[in-house]
Amino acid sequence: ACAAPPPAAAPPADELEMWLGTLKGSQKVIYDCVMPAGGLDGILFARNFLKFSQEKLGTKDADMSVIVSFRHFATPYGYNDAMWAKYPQFASMLKVQDPKSMKPAARNVPLHDEIEGFPGASLPALSARGAQVTVCGAATAYLAGILAGPKGDAGATEKELLANLVPGARVVPAGVVVVQRAQKAGFAYTFAG
């Protein structure tokens, strides 16, 4: 008797699934950064995954697909220094002090400094190793409304935030959507806090 051929894989349902399909590493993980400390922990966890997979197991960066997803209260880590300087609410909301000045951060600290002093635990270092960053579009719209206030233009503020993402970041409809789609695409899920 002949076995029936396996069903053909369904084509990607949308742009997000198509993008996830381009991430070809056999070792796949998404770090779900939800709370303020989770943004920093997600960066550190991604660094540890890349570092120790390579050093202890010999896994090459090309064989690893890593996503750090900033959503909910960790979303501001997806914006560049200009937005952190313009909107001091990010530092107060996330309770982030600049380790150089010991004052509320007026810059996106992980764009410049290594988390907890660990070499390679920064956004540029992760990017150089092929890690991807996603930024929650739903949280961005919510934050834009808060930043604009009742008399401001939330739509214009949202456009400004989306035009000022950290280098290489990708906006996604919602962080919960990329988390689900990544798991569907074979990514292991890690809650970073």
Residue map of PLM features:
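Secreted/extracellular ectodomain signature
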Residues: 2-193
